[in-house]
């Protein structure tokens, strides 16, 4: 009986991971927690007990993309990484770090390029953008920095058809800035040289 229940739970985890991966691949949901919750509802689960973790969902996403998006996703990822390199070169004075799906290789047509930037004065980025005539929107996001919470300015712009999110931290917070999802395999942040290496440059 216990073995059957365990097998059933494993099957449900795999089903939810697959459904979450499909939502991320086909509907552009970027948030793992939201995709997981929506997938659980689709699977008819009333609570969050025994749901897959981010690593399982990421593995399912890679499998889904390999099966159903192999003709398009690699080219989309390459374009986003090329744009990321372009932006990181232009914003080199802010010590940019690439995070998220463009780095881990699961990005697709719906994905943003997400960069962490570092400045003595966060307002200096707004001046930098204005001087280069970028059109952008701005807000703030509450994020955890070490043991504390902070409001981090976020700038949203478009470069070569790709949406770019710039999160601006104080220079002293580089070692505290979020490192993407802690469960994910592989590097969670990358400097310009690392991204260039991914492109074979």
Task: Give the location of each predicted region.
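Catalytic core of pol beta-like nucleotidyltransferases
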Residues: 2-29, 36-109, 120-201
């Amino acid at each position: 009986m216990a073995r059957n229940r365990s097998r059933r739970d494993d099957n449900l985890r795999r089903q939810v991971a697959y459904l979450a991966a499909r939502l991320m691949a086909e509907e552009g949901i970027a948030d793992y927690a939201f995709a997981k919750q929506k997938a659980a509802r689709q699977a008819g689960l009333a609570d969050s007990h025994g749901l897959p973790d981010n690593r399982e969902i990421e593995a399912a996403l890679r499998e889904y993309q390999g099966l159903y998006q192999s003709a398009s996703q690699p080219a989309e990822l390459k374009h986003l990484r090329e744009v990321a390199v372009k932006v990181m070169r232009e914003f080199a004075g802010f010590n940019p770090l690439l995070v998220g799906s463009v780095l881990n290789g699961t990005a697709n047509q719906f994905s943003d390029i997400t960069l962490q930037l570092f400045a003595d004065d966060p307002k200096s980025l707004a001046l930098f953008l204005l001087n280069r005539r970028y059109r952008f929107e701005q807000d703030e996001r509450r994020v955890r920095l070490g043991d504390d919470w902070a409001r981090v300015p976020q700038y949203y712009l478009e470069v070569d058809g790709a949406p770019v999110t710039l999160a601006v931290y104080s220079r002293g917070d580089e070692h505290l800035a979020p490192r993407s999802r802690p469960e994910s395999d592989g590097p969670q942040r990358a400097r310009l040289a690392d991204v260039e290496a991914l492109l074979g440059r």
